[in-house]
Amino acid sequence: MAAEDIAQLADCLAKANVGDGELSFKGKTLKLNTAQDAEEVIREIEEYEGLQALRLEGNTVGVEAAKAIAEVLQRKPDLKRCHWSDMFTGRLRPEIPTALRSLGDALITAGAQLTELDLSDNAFGPDGVRGFEALLKSPTCFTLQELKLNNCGMGIGGGKILAAALTECHKKSSAHGKPLALKVFIAGRNRLENDGATALSEAFRLIGTLEEVHMPQNGINHAGITALAESFKANSLLKVINLNDNTFTEKGGVAMAEALKTLRQVEVINFGDCLVRSKGAQAIASALKEGLHKLKDLNLSYCEIKADAAVSLAESVEDKSDLEKLDLNGNCLGEEGCEQVQEILESINMANILGSLSDDEDEDDDDDDEDDDDDEDDENDDEEVEEEEEEVEEEEGGDNENKEKSKEIPCLSGSAPASPPKLPVDASTFLSFPSPEKLVRMGPRRSAMIAQQVNVADTEKVVQAFIQVSSVYREDGEIKAAVEETIDGLMKEAFENRGFQANVFITSLLVQMGLLKSEDKMKTIPHLNGPLLTLNHMVQQNYFPKSLASTLLAFISKPNGVLENNASARHTLLCNLHNL
């Protein structure tokens, strides 16, 4: 290590002790490859008496450094909270399980009693779960209350390994007279799918003490949702259920509603982007009428819910005095339906809880019953997101142009044959009021249309166009592809234009994202997930000047509350920036 690097590290360490038994190296971007690199970190850990929490997130720890840190952790029996998210950036996947195994073995040797383990944003895959499997099964985790594994790429295999480890932990801890009492489980963006979710549901049912479950964006369909719903019935203390961006359909919606009827402590329900549809929403409305009196936040946005079901939901919250937010945006209420919902809430003095309805779609004429029949006929095909989409393809002769197939785009399925086709969207219409559906409806020429509409020599206009396009980003394949294709067309032309100022573009974009202060007061982007993931795509393209990577890296890696709320997207972008 160079002398100046050691001095910088020492300065960081001087500020690391944050009290309450916590030693923090959070966001220091330390590159700890060898035992020598980790000497100062090890010294600080060694000298910290009564260490209860260790923050290593936002650094990168290699196998040798992990082994060296593990040696000192063997002498820290008071350690309770391990904040070890995002600490393997730039590491090869095979390195991570070895490093985790060393650290885990050290905690076991020390006789530590963990209450919190956070390994989020470490892309270790199924093999990585093997790296801390022994730790989870050991007495060190008998006291575990919070397990955070967001965005780790576990997949189905990793989900099954994790479920088995939790089950064994509960079994062993029960034998010792104090069963595992896990309260918080976080595992979003892991592609657990039905099999992984079902395996975990068995562990949840056994544990029975969960208060928060966060499993968004896992590709779970109605079979997995139903299994989770059954397990939730055994967890009567549940307060937060976040299954955003999975695929319930009516079956999953009804099953989850039945589970909600048995729960009395629920405060937050996030089923946004879950394709609950009207019958699922009606079932949830019924559950609301029967209970859920502590509910504070209900998100059923982008679920293909029609006006009648939305009205039922509005009527069902009348006695929910704690309710602070009801999100029904992006559904199929139509203008009259929106007005009805607003009038109902106004009549019970709850108009203030309703979120924006700006992305609402007109109510289609199709019948949910037809869609539901399709679901019933397709028992063996859990991997299909929307069976009725296949019917639309057949009716249209297999023509894919201007076809809306994503579950993220509300109410695009099951159109009656007599319904007139939706007209294509032009660039100016999209840029005025961006939405995922409009971008898809622009068709295969969307990239050229946007690039032609925007004066790429005007850097600020390119910034605005980038923000507008990236704001509709979704993980769904069709929308994601449309966003990336459009950005490629726009930015390739911009970077090749002599009048375009690349450095100004990056600076202005950082300001708009709230990551760089500006002397002028301006409104920043409220949601950064789409822009961050779109940036992640852009920086990997040949047209992107690699000289700009250092600027982005400097600001994206800095501690920032807004970025911490988008940790998964931030981690993905940082990994690719480090690799440039």
From Swiss-Prot:
Acidic residues: compositionally biased ranges: 358-399
Cystine connections: none
Main localization category: cytoplasm
Entry keyword set: Centromere, Chromosome, Cytoplasm, Cytoskeleton, GTPase activation, Kinetochore, Leucine-rich repeat, Nucleus, Repeat, Ubl conjugation
GO molecular function terms noted in the UniProt entry: GTPase activator activity; small GTPase binding
GO BP terms in the entry: nuclear export; signal transduction
Chain intervals for the UniProt region annotation (Disordered): 356-429
Database matches in Pfam families: LRR_6, RanGAP1_C
Quaternary structure annotation from Swiss-Prot or TrEMBL: Homodimer. Identified in a complex with RANBP2 and the ubiquitin-conjugating enzyme E2 (UBE2I).
Function of the protein: GTPase activator for RAN, converting it to the GDP-bound state. Converts cytoplasmic GTP-bound RAN to GDP-bound RAN, which is required for RAN-mediated nuclear import and export.
Family per record: Belongs to the RNA1 family.
Protein name, per record: Ran GTPase-activating protein 1
Species this protein is from: Xenopus laevis (African clawed frog)
Organism lineage: Eukaryota, Metazoa, Chordata, Craniata, Vertebrata
